[in-house]
Amino acid sequence: EVCSSCHSMKYVSYRNLAEKGGPEFTEEQAKAIAASFEVMDGPNADGEMFSRPGKLSDKFVMPYENVKAAQAANGGAYPPDMSVLVKARGGGVDYIYSLLQGYEDPPVGITLDDGVYYNKFMYGNKIKMANQLSDGLVEYGDGTNATIEQMSKDVTTFLMWTAEPHLETRHKM
């Protein structure tokens, strides 16, 4: 919910949400999630592109039309694609988990430009992404307390799955 407003997941399809080992939504739930997004398709018989509700076979919709639009909306920074981020970053899940919880006020003597935030786990301690998590930000259906720690765990678990959606199945072979 929170990350998808800026970050893409271009290697994940909506159908993956209903597969074993992942979030395991029902097929109907995954269809409803897909249909809540507009997808550009085409061309039609007249050679024109058109918009339609998403379907299970579609990849996750990108939050921006292109790199320049993403940079313009994010102070010049391009939010990385999240679908394989835990595999691309040194430290993987542990790094992202720590990064999500590493926001602090900068130490005395450190000044930051507008739109730059201090994060004790980011290389150089400066990051363009503001802290996205706060206690109570989301509501869990099972009543789980939505702490920053819990949401960080859930985000990184989900991102590990997106990077290796069939890992569990391969391990059972």
Show where each model-derived region lies:
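Extended, hydrophilic extramembrane loops/domains of integral membrane proteins
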Residues: 123, 127-164
